[in-house]
């Protein structure tokens, strides 16, 4: 009986040792595959850090948008708006950020007329674009705003001498205007400019 008992005990222990050895060999394969999968995201993170490193190089310049108004325009008003260091209607531009850089360019200007005249009034306000600041008074009345209705005109860089950089000491362009109505208030101009600044001081 004891001999049979030993055989049955030994018979059971032998397959257990074999299964344990088989189980010990399996985790080795799993560990190798997990190491390979962990290395791939590390390479991607290094690539992301390189792209972020290029961001500070863009700090050499700045892009800004300014909105200002020219109020209390009479139906017979006339004048000019010079864009550059002479733009006194927008001190945040002329006396602010413009003094922090060596060069600038205005890439777009939007001229809007906000009517304040009654429907019984008549007349219009003509405007003209001077891309080289050579005109002192209006020379053409083709483009105009009726004083009883709102109007809008937009000019891109090619129309306002805005493709090249300008020294901050020189003006870029002008808008001249002249009305043919009465002396009563006709409305106001709402002006939006998109600017770029280069080479900080």
Swiss-Prot record:
Residue spans of biased composition, Low complexity class: 50-59
Subcellular location: Virion
GO cellular component terms attached to this protein's record: viral capsid
Keyword check for Chaperone: no
Superkingdom classification of source: Viruses
Keywords: Capsid protein, Virion
Composition-biased stretches (Basic residues): 9-23, 37-49
Region annotation Disordered: where it falls in the sequence: 1-63
Major localisation: virion
One protein family per Pfam: Luteo_coat
GO function terms (MF aspect): structural molecule activity
Function statement: Major capsid protein that self-assembles to form an icosahedral capsid with a T=3 symmetry, about 23 nm in diameter, and consisting of 180 capsid proteins monomers. Most of the 180 monomers are the major capsid protein, but a small percentage contain the minor capsid protein, which has a long C-terminal extension.
Comment text on domains: The N-terminus like those of many plant virus capsid proteins is highly basic. These regions may be involved in protein-RNA interaction.
Record-stated family: Belongs to the luteoviruses capsid protein family.
Protein name: Major capsid protein
Organism: Beet western yellows virus (isolate GB1) (BWYV)
């Amino acid at each position: 009986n004891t001999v049979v008992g030993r055989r049955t005990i030994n018979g059971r222990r032998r397959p257990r040792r074999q299964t344990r050895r088989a189980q010990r060999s399996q985790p080795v394969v799993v560990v190798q595959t997990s190491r390979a999968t962990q290395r791939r995201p590390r390479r991607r993170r290094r690539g992301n850090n390189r792209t972020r490193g290029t961001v500070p190089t863009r700090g050499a310049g700045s892009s800004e948008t300014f909105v200002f108004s020219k109020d209390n325009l009479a139906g017979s008003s006339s004048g000019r708006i010079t864009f550059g260091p002479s733009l006194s209607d927008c001190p945040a531009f002329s006396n602010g950020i413009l003094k922090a850089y060596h060069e600038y360019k205005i890439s777009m200007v939007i001229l809007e007329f906000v009517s304040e005249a009654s429907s019984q009034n008549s007349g219009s306000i003509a405007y003209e674009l001077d891309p080289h600041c050579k005109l002192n008074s209006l020379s053409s009345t083709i483009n105009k705003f009726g004083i009883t209705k709102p109007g809008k005109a937009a000019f891109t860089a090619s129309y306002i001498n805005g493709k090249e950089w300008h020294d901050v000491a020189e003006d870029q362009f002008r808008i001249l205007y002249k009305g043919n109505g009465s002396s009563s208030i006709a409305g106001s101009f709402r002006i939006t400019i998109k600017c770029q600044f280069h080479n900080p001081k």
